[in-house]
Amino acid sequence: MELEIALMLRPEAGALISGGKGLRKIRRPLSGRGKSGGARVIYYYISNNATIYLVFAYAKNRQPDLTKDQLATLTKFVASQIS
């Protein structure tokens, strides 16, 4: 619930992902790890109707960043949902 509230208050807080066609990434702490070793949440924000799609999350210790294939899949998924 903390994440949802944080994004409602500051929906553009996450960094835009290069090549992500509007996808954003925000860091969130995991229990006992802090932000840098925590989770990454990928989301898409549509400002004209204040809609936020949470599309993917992962622990940084399992994967440092999205792969090119994952990014391509996520951008296609978002495009199919908002068209």
Q: Where do the model's predicted regions map?
A:
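Basic, Lys/Arg-enriched alpha-helical interface segments
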Residues: 1-35, 48-49, 59, 63-83
